């Protein structure tokens, strides 16, 4: 399926991991990816474990984990800290649910403002602009 993922240069490594070279360097600066030794007069080489680690970071980012949270998950990656990893995921799930609630409120307020704009077409005052200027708060805006 995949070619040999050992002894890779940074460019080949980045491509195999699905990122660019600057992402690799950024992860190294952040401590998410160890920087391999550089043999005298040679270039650093990366392996399959490095590719797997970068893919892990990208997957965790897609789930909404911050780089600090990902660093913590990587620290727990020895298989003996499932409870701690689960706790981190539970906190992230709660954050996601709170954001979804906030987004639903925002959607309601924006929908009302758009409707009000369409209903008052031709009037001098736009309800959306007036609301954003603080002249009149739409229903539910205080909850956002």
Swiss-Prot record:
NCBIfam families: MerR, PRK13752.1. Keywords: Activator, DNA-binding, Mercuric resistance, Mercury, Metal-binding, Plasmid, Repressor, Transcription, Transcription regulation. GO terms for molecular function: DNA binding; DNA-binding transcription factor activity; mercury ion binding. CDD domains: HTH_MerR1. It comes from Serratia marcescens. Gene3D superfamilies: 1.10.1660.10. Mediates the mercuric-dependent induction of mercury resistance operon. In the absence of mercury MerR represses transcription by binding tightly to the mer operator region; when mercury is present the dimeric complex binds a single ion and becomes a potent transcriptional activator, while remaining bound to the mer site. Residues 10-29 bind DNA. PANTHER family: MERR-FAMILY TRANSCRIPTIONAL REGULATOR, REDOX-CYCLING DRUG-SENSING TRANSCRIPTIONAL ACTIVATOR SOXR. Hg(2+) binds at residues 82, 117, 126. This is Mercuric resistance operon regulatory protein. Residues 7-76 form the HTH merR-type domain. InterPro entries: DNA-bd_dom_put_sf, MerR, MerR-type_HTH_dom, MerR_fam, Tscrpt_reg_MerR_DNA-bd. Disulfide bonds: none annotated. GO terms for biological process: response to mercury ion. It comes from the Bacteria. It holds the Pfam family MerR. The keyword Repressor applies.
């Amino acid at each position: 399926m995949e070619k040999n993922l050992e002894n890779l240069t940074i460019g080949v490594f980045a491509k195999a991991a699905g990122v660019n070279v600057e992402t690799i360097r950024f992860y190294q600066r952040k401590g998410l990816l160890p920087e391999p030794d550089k043999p005298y007069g040679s270039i650093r080489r990366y392996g399959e474990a490095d590719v797997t680690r970068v893919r892990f970071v990208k997957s965790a980012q897609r789930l909404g984990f911050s780089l600090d949270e990902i660093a913590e998950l990587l620290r727990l990656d020895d298989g003996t800290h499932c409870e701690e990893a689960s706790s981190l995921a539970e906190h992230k799930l709660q954050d996601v649910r709170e954001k979804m609630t906030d987004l639903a409120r925002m959607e309601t307020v924006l929908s009302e403002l758009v409707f009000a704009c369409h209903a008052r077409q031709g009037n001098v005052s736009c309800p959306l602009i007036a609301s954003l200027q603080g002249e009149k708060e739409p229903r539910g805006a205080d909850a956002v």
